[in-house]
Amino acid sequence: MKHKLIDDELKYLDERSRDIFRHIVEAYLNDGGPVGSRNLSRLLRQTLSPATIRNVMSDLEHLGLIYAPHVSAGRMPTQSGLRFFVDAFMEAGDLPNEERENIEAQVKEAGHAQSVEHFLVQASQVLSDLSRGAGLVLATKHEGTLKHIEFVRLDGEHALAVLVTQQGGVENRIVHLPEGVTHAQLTEATNFLNAHIQGLTLSEAKEEIARLCSETRAALDHLSHHLVETGLALWGGEGADHKIRLIVRGRSNLLEDVKAEEDLKRLRHLFDDLETRESMAQLLDLTDEGSGVRIFIGSENKLFSLSGSSLVVAPYRDSQQKVIGALGVIGPTRLNYARIVPMVDYTAQLVSQLLR
């Protein structure tokens, strides 16, 4: 969907202005630096003098599409200019067959693993390797079906509650033991839970155990009953951000683009944001607003607005077409959008297929 800004600015740009603007942006995407009028005159299809090109560049600068990073420098696109370029000029082509086959082979191989976590980590790694940016996966902690729960005594006051899902996930929690709990009571609570929770999701298991406990209170002694109720209560009750896993691979790739102290500050902001993982649920909501790939450039990306980074992200869905996560590439604003957009889109489609 085009921004109104795009439609307004297209009215003022003739073919010559568009051609010059496009070459300025493409030069920036290639090497990250400004381009001057002399270099542009050699790149353009039309024969134009440097003076004529400078006049056009002045008009583009007045429109807020380009700027000079310092006096007597060439011109670079502004954030608005990059958005204008992406929406008005960029054509996302098809992935080369070699890259398509590479993504498919690696993602499908990881899909054979029992652990969904391993599968998503590999998807993030594939995106990082191919994009030379950082591959990012946001995954909701979807409810797998339960296979086994066990209490393992640690000391007189604590036990380790171990939950295993049929999808291969394992989670551990420390539970405080009521005074006087015996080994036999731990075993009784474990056996009771495992007799009734297999094949259920966690929320279904909680409802079922609550119902059974009210009906069979006499069948369990007081301490065993307490363990059964607290055993399942340990999981859940988390805020929205904590129900989302953030997987990032390829942070070191971002260091390759560092050219100045300002770049280091930008990266520090980005790494801090990735570590704190605040408001990740908001990003997941943003991906759900569209049907395909979303591109967030610079401050458009509210999560990483201080880092001067761009994010190309797409949702992946379950069999009911519900968004259950998102994946993408984060990097400098001079990402190769035309190449990365189809890469992210295809990977999201593969992940959706394999998780159904």
Curated annotation (Swiss-Prot):
Domain of life of the organism encoding this protein: Bacteria
Molecular function in Gene Ontology: DNA binding
InterPro entries membership: GAF-like_dom_sf, HrcA, HrcA_C, WH-like_DNA-bd_sf, WH_DNA-bd_sf, WHTH_transcript_rep_HrcA_IDD
Keywords, sorted A to Z: Repressor, Stress response, Transcription, Transcription regulation
Repressor is among the record's keywords: yes
GO biological process, one term: negative regulation of DNA-templated transcription
Family designation: Belongs to the HrcA family.
Role played: Negative regulator of class I heat shock genes (grpE-dnaK-dnaJ and groELS operons). Prevents heat-shock induction of these operons.
Protein name per the record: Heat-inducible transcription repressor HrcA
